[in-house]
Each structure stands twice: as C-alpha cells, then as structure tokens.
C-alpha cells in the first residue's frame, strides 16, 4: 500500500508539539530527522536530544488529502512554515531493509554476516547476526574498531566482559575467536534478549552469561574488558569498568568522538598504560593494559 509523507519543519522546542499534531491529524507514525546538517552525539541524562532545526515526518495513508493538514500547520505556525509532501511508492520495506546489511570483514579472521545471507568464507570466523532491537551490527565505526581490536588478540582460554553488550556482537565475536567465557552486561532488557538470541544462533549460548547491572557477578575480574557505549557513561563509570579488569589485563573503550578522547585518556590513565587513540572517521577507540 502506498503512503504519503508530510514533512513539517520545527525547532527543538516545538518538535514534540508538531509530532502530537501530526498524530492527532491521523498520522500512522511520526519520525524526526535533522533539517540541516547538525550532528547530535549524546543527550544529557533524562533528555531526548533533538536538532535545533528538526523535521517532523508524518506517515499517512495514501487516500488522505494533505491540503487540510498543511493548512492546519500554516494556521498555527504561519503561512511560511516549511513543509514538504511526498508520495511513497509501494515497496517490500522488510526486503529493502534486509538488502542494506551485507557481510563485513574485520581484521584478518573475522566476518560479521546477516543471518539471512550466505557466509563469504566458510573457513573464516563467522558471526551470524540479526540486528534486532539493539545497537551493534558492525556498520558503525565504533563497533568496527572494537571488532578489529578483538580480531588482533589471542583470546584462546581468556575471560572477557562486554560492558554494554547491545546485540551481543562483541561478546559473540570474542567467543568465536576463542574466548573461554564471556559476560555481557547491559541496562536494557531488550539488549539482553537480542544478545541471547544471537548467541543461540551462533552456538555459543552456553559460554555467554548475560546480566542486567544489578545482577552481575560481584568481585569478578576478567582478562579483557570491552565497552562500546558513550563518552559520558565511560567517564562516570570509569572506576567500575577498570575494576572489572585483572592486573595486566586488557581494556578497550569506544563510542568516543576524537574530540572526547584526550579527557578519557587522562581518566583511564589512572589504572591503565594507555595506547594512542585508534581513529575511524570522526570516532575512536582507546585501549590499554591494566597496571599491576
């Protein structure tokens, strides 16, 4: 079934109001996008961060007449309110989405493959993944940086903590690369469920332990810890994350912009001999060895 998109430009302050109006006028769904080209990286605690110039996009059935809807917004926000009306052709959107994800190689041994595709190299270390509801498909630079780091390590017989496990991509990759035991921790129950599903898909569910933070093992230290989250939590939880690493163990953190790296290098240098940042696009990974 074809659809109509009605796009109304708003500000960060008026975007929620515009969204509610679109829903009240019969929109089946409303999404936000940047009306300019302004990146938003990290909201404050409890804040839903929006762009200064935000475009609200209402999705309507094709038989809906857009003229009265546009007139409604012109009445409320002025005749010059920016808007756009588009007819969306009928497509198999699930198939379109699935076509977007292709197998990807990280380092020398590791491939991340959507579960609905054939693996390019059956002799490689292949992780089959469904993105599900949790972040982490390998397409984001921070995930790629962590996967490359894991591929570079000798993980045979090692224990590892994936702090903020998301889809489970890093935890599962570590197990497929030879880790003996991996603990995944996440604040989101949906992430725990996605990690569990992906672990079963890859035949490593017996080796992967998944916990919400309040349930994680006490006084446990791993040979290796990886945390691909955001700069704010990495800073605030630095003591907790560092405490998960054994003396002389390894740690990698990502989800960090290049501009945020110097501060976090200083923070983690309390506990680790840190290496220079590894950069990809505008993001970076920091890694180091725990001081004895």
Curated annotation (Swiss-Prot):
GO cellular component, one term: cytosol
EC identifiers of the protein: 2.1.1.-
An MF annotation (GO) of this entry: protein-lysine N-methyltransferase activity
InterPro entries: Ribosomal_L11_MeTrfase_PrmA, Ribosomal_PrmA_MeTrfase, SAM-dependent_MTases_sf
The keyword Nucleus appears for this protein: no
Record's keyword terms, sorted: Cytoplasm, Methyltransferase, S-adenosyl-L-methionine, Transferase
Root EC class: transferase
Keyword Methyltransferase applies: yes
GO biological process: methylation
Catalysed reactions listed for this entry: L-lysyl-[protein] + 3 S-adenosyl-L-methionine = N(6),N(6),N(6)-trimethyl-L-lysyl-[protein] + 3 S-adenosyl-L-homocysteine + 3 H(+)
UniProt-annotated binding residues for S-adenosyl-L-methionine: 143, 164, 186, 228
Family named by the database record: Belongs to the methyltransferase superfamily. PrmA family.
Free-text function comment from the UniProt entry: Methylates ribosomal protein L11.
Protein's name according to its UniProt entry: Ribosomal protein L11 methyltransferase
Origin species: Tolumonas auensis (strain DSM 9187 / NBRC 110442 / TA 4)
Taxonomic placement: Bacteria, Pseudomonadati, Pseudomonadota, Gammaproteobacteria, Aeromonadales
Gene behind this protein: prmA
């Amino acid at each position: 079934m074809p659809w109509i998109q009605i796009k109304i430009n708003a500000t960060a302050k008026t975007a929620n109001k515009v969204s509610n109006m679109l829903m009240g006028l019969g929109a089946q769904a409303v999404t936000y996008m940047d009306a300019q080209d302004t990146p938003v990286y990290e909201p404050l605690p409890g804040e839903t961060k929006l762009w200064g110039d935000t475009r609200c996009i209402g999705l309507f059935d094709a038989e809906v007449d857009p003229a009265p809807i546009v007139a409604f917004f012109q009445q409320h926000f002025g005749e010059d309110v920016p808007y756009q009306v588009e007819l969306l052709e009928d497509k198999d959107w699930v198939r379109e989405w699935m076509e977007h994800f292709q197998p990807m190689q990280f380092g020398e041994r590791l491939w991340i493959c959507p579960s609905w595709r054939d693996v390019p190299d059956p002799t490689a270390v292949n992780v089959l993944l469904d993105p599900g509801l949790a972040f982490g498909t390998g397409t984001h630079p921070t995930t790629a940086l962590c996967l490359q780091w894991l591929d570079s390590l000798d993980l045979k017989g090692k224990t590892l903590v994936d702090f903020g496990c998301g889809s489970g991509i890093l935890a599962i990759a570590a197990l497929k690369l030879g880790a003996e035991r991996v603990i995944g921790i996440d604040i989101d129950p949906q992430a725990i469920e996605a990690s569990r599903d992906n672990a079963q898909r890859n035949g490593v569910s017996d080796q992967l332990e998944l916990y919400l933070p309040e349930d994680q093992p006490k006084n446990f230290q791993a040979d290796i810890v990886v945390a691909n989250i955001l700069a704010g939590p990495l800073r605030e939880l630095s003591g907790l994350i560092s405490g998960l690493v054994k003396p002389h163990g390894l740690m990698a953190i990502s989800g960090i912009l290049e501009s945020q790296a110097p501060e976090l290098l200083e923070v983690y240098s309390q506990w680790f001999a840190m290496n220079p940042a590894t950069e990809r696009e505008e993001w970076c990974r920091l890694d180091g060895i725990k001081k004895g």
